[in-house]
Design a protein with these regions (language model features):
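Nucleic-acid nuclease catalytic cores
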Residues: 205
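Conserved Walker B catalytic segment
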Residues: 196-201
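Short, amphipathic alpha-helical interaction segments positioned at domain boundaries
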Residues: 80-107
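Detector for Asparagine
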Residues: 2, 91-94, 116
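Glycine-rich, often proline-containing surface loops adjacent to acidic residues and nearby aromatics
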Residues: 33-35, 86-94, 175-183
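Basic, Lys/Arg-rich alpha-helical nucleic-acid-recognition elements, primarily the DNA-binding modules
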Residues: 1-86
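Exposed, interaction-prone assembly regions rather than primary DNA-binding/catalytic cores
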Residues: 99-194
Length: 205
């Protein structure tokens, strides 16, 4: 994963260390939610001053909120427009409040990202659409999409890859050229029908 140095520097300008800034960038782009356990995993730190100081800094500056997570700890939501604005992604839905199932899915998704940092991820909807339509020549008609109806005065909006699950380049076997890989993240509460509807989206769009 290649994190843009300019964006990391801008997050550092808000008072964060380099490792904190890199972690916050990953959270902002891919999840919006995280636990201090995930922060400790990313930074290689133990329980104690470092994660506590990081959490206090986030809350004091109003960059995140915290809530109880299934009575097993706390879950943090990085919501501040200031942070997202520093990386030119203040329109991401990760900033918004979501259901518990959504948060759980995003935590599982972040676990995957942190465990596979060597992969080349497509960060945004536009990155994904551009890769398929411009580099691979795939018509947008065949991309997974959802139509959002507007008001009587506005046109419907078509959004692509709305699940925002990780999409990345990876080699199927050692030494082979990388291929684009789509993923599905199960929060643990989904029904089989949800996976089926997800898996057939590309064919039905």
């Amino acid at each position: 994963m290649n994190l843009p140095a300019a964006h990391i520097e801008r997050i550092r300008d808000l008072g964060y260390t380099d490792s904190e800034a890199r972690f916050l960038y990953i959270v902002a782009v891919f999840s919006g939610y995280f636990t201090l356990g995930q922060f400790r995993l990313f930074t290689g730190s133990a329980y104690g001053k470092r994660p506590t100081s990081f959490a206090q800094k986030l809350l004091k500056q109003g960059h995140a909120t915290v809530r109880d997570y299934m009575r097993r700890g706390s879950i943090y939501h990085l919501f501040s427009r200031t942070v997202y604005g520093q990386i030119e992604k203040d329109n991401l839905r990760n900033r918004k409040k979501h259901s518990f199932d959504f948060m759980r899915t995003r935590l599982v998704l972040l676990d995957f990202i942190l465990a596979n940092q060597e992969l080349a991820y497509f960060e945004t909807e536009q990155d994904k659409v551009s890769f398929f339509s411009e580099q691979l020549g795939v018509s947008k008609d065949f991309l997974p999409a959802k139509v959002y109806e507007g008001s009587s005065r506005t046109q419907p909006t078509i959004r692509y890859f709305v699940d925002k699950f990780p999409l990345f380049l990876a080699s199927p076997v050692s030494g082979a050229p990388p291929v684009v890989t789509l993923s599905y993240v199960d929060s643990g509460f989904e029904t089989p029908s949800h996976f089926v509807s997800h898996s057939v989206l590309p064919a039905s769009s």
